[in-house]
Amino acid sequence: MVLPLILTLVIVAPIFLWMYSWYISAIPKHYVKPGTKLQKKVHSNLRILEQKYHPSWWCPFGTTQTVVRQIFRDCPSLPFTREIVEFDDGGAAGIDWLIPEGADDTTPIVVFLPGITGSTHDSSYVLHPVKEARDKGWKCVVVNPRGLGGVKLRTTRTYNAATPHDFAFIAKMINERYPDAKKLGCGFSMGGMILWNYLAMTGENADLDGGMIVSSPWDPLVASDSIECFIPQLIFNSFIAKNLVDMVRPYRELFKDMVDFDEVCRCNTVRGFDRSFVIPMYGFKSCDDYYRQATLATKVDKIKIPCVTLNSVDDYFSPVECIPTLDIMESDYVCGIITNHGGHTAFMESADPNARGMVEKLLSQWGNMIFHDYS
């Protein structure tokens, strides 16, 4: 009895998953203000908005996609060149350049911002889009926050989602070095929050020509509630909290007079880490105050360069009800894209976790628009 049952499941389960993945496939919803230049350019350049998004047949669910991409997607070895950026306060960060053959001072540049504890060589969700951009002939630079990417902290300043001043410094440096090159910022998760808050802070004076935000939480308070539910807490939140603690653990002596380091080391949620480390470090009144200042949803009207956002309904980190679609529809500069499936930064389409997915396709098409069809 057991063997026939197992054989039946082995045969039936893949068929069911394949049929289910096609059943749930749908054209992504998109939100863009009618009659604007942005709408015309989006409709003529973003072919992905005309095609159904087919999640991977064996991995159609958001949570499994996120886990599979994280565990099984490789980190391609790319010939980056490291540059150390020295900040005015004595701190430093590492940025990694990837320059294609034949590039010159006018070659377009994509500036990548990894997620909360991500850096150049350990973030497959960044490296595959970097490879996509490089293959298009674009220069790439990955911006690692202070304390990550192999550059040790020199001061007590780290990074947070509400304070994009380090990125502003780097974006200005890149723009001054390559004034004749168009530049696109591409941020993932918390990196997207930093990018969005930079664009909101600088408005039309941004040192970028366009933005792309992938899987960023629109409201950090609601996102924190979401990832503290049982399943995401077990799979994601506790893992990220451990990475955050491990990131600052070597600097106990540096921070001993500023935070309760024993409390920091006991954190098992992102909110707990924010409460015990980020809040006292940056002088926020509370987590609510920090999250209010970091939120994206209230700043759509402050974005003054073309920016596309990509989110999935089944992403625990970015509850879809927080996406300000009405505000986006009133903006001349923001296009919001929402898929029913895709998880957090995953957006798998092939059975192969390493294969090109929706993020790479969007980067290619949006980048072409910004660099060659938006002036």
UniProtKB/Swiss-Prot annotation:
The keyword Hydrolase applies. The gene is abhd-3.2. PROSITE patterns: UPF0017. PANTHER family: ABHYDROLASE DOMAIN-CONTAINING PROTEIN, ALPHA_BETA HYDROLASE 1, ISOFORM A. The active site is at S189 (charge relay system), D315 (charge relay system), H344 (charge relay system). It is an enzyme of class 3 (hydrolase). This is Protein abhd-3.2. Belongs to the AB hydrolase superfamily. AB hydrolase 4 family. Keywords: Hydrolase, Serine esterase. It comes from Caenorhabditis elegans. One of its GO terms (biological process) is medium-chain fatty acid catabolic process. The keyword Transit peptide does not apply. Residues 108-203 form the AB hydrolase-1 domain. Its EC number is 3.1.1.-. GO terms for molecular function: acetylesterase activity; monoacylglycerol lipase activity.
